């Protein structure tokens, strides 16, 4: 193997290792297992003035006590995302937007809705916990969604951390 292939392969392996447990970046010692609640608490601890008394960032399916086998983050919890989580053996889905049609994810009126039932029942059947993360990620010191969009668009040179305005 030449040096270029070695560096490329090593970088891919290291990157894959970092993706395996993103919470390793938050500590010097690795923890063997994490519960949904511990992941939530670790995230919320980074947000100024959190936790919030009123927020949509609650568990919609599952339990804080679930031991996490993998995490899928997404903008929207579609059936495709739920199936991908099952395929990856990930039992925590963290969406940004509502899963069940309303901003508050109120589901009382949806109990007989076939789309609601399909999503909810599939997650429940596979032991998936769904924790919505909308308010907390927007209220981080640097809005997490903004930082993600800036990175995806390659606009880092136009962005000043903490600023809401990009100078393009």
Task: List each model region and its residues.
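Hydrophobic structural segments
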Residues: 2-168
